[in-house]
């Protein structure tokens, strides 16, 4: 596997036991864990309510629906990469519908090597999504710090009659003097004065 330090969780939606057996051989536990199999879309939807998967692999069509709508819905979950395997006769039509939604597609029948390449593409896409998620988390944390510092400034302005500039300087200086983050200091000020 390309990203050997990562283990990917996989949900396989397929009613074809022969396909499931072949795919099991391609998903070693060292790279893919857990690997859960369900045979229809209803069970897959229930499974996605319970946990987030890195990969969802759909072997269409399924007994209860074609699988295209589910592929789009599963792809809209943050960080989930979806591969939809579809019959070659309808490949172009379905690919045109789902590719713009971020769903990877491959035509069936499929060679083992092609499927392995698809898994590598999925890993690459998942790692890119993981980096974007980390950036988003960092931005959210920064915004939370700014909100707390601003709230602490307003408390200092109201309680100690400081100007905004004085309150800002006070928070910066106290954080440096105490060797704590501005967020920690702001939380302490908020707790003290409210």
Language model segments and positions:
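Conserved acidic segment of CheY-like receiver
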Residues: 6-18, 23-27, 56
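Alpha4 helix (beta4-alpha4-beta5 surface) of REC/receiver domains from two-component response regulators
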Residues: 68-69, 88-104
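A short, hydrophobic beta-strand element within the central beta-sheet of small alpha/beta folds
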Residues: 79-89
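C-terminal output helix
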Residues: 110-119
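The C-terminal output helix
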Residues: 120-134
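C-terminal output/effector regions of signal-responsive regulators
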Residues: 137-194
């Amino acid at each position: 596997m390309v990203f050997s330090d990562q283990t990917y969780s996989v949900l396989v939606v397929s009613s074809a036991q022969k396909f499931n057996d072949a795919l099991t051989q391609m998903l070693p536990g060292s790279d893919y864990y857990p690997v859960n199999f369900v045979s229809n879309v209803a069970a897959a939807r229930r499974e996605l309510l319970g946990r987030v998967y890195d990969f969802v692999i759909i072997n269409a069509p399924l007994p209860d629906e074609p699988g295209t709508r589910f592929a789009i819905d599963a792809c809209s979950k943050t960080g989930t990469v979806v591969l939809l395997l579809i019959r070659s006769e309808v490949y172009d039509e379905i690919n045109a519908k789902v590719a713009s939604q971020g769903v990877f597609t491959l035509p069936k029948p499929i060679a083992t090597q092609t499927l392995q390449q698809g898994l590598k593409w999925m890993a690459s896409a998942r790692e890119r999504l993981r980096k974007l998620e980390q950036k988003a988390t960092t931005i959210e944390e920064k915004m939370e710090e700014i909100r707390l510092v601003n709230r602490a400034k307003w408390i200092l302005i109201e309680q100690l009659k400081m100007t905004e500039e004085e309150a800002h300087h006070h928070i910066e200086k106290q954080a440096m003097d105490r060797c704590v983050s501005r967020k920690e200091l702001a939380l302490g000020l908020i707790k003290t004065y409210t």
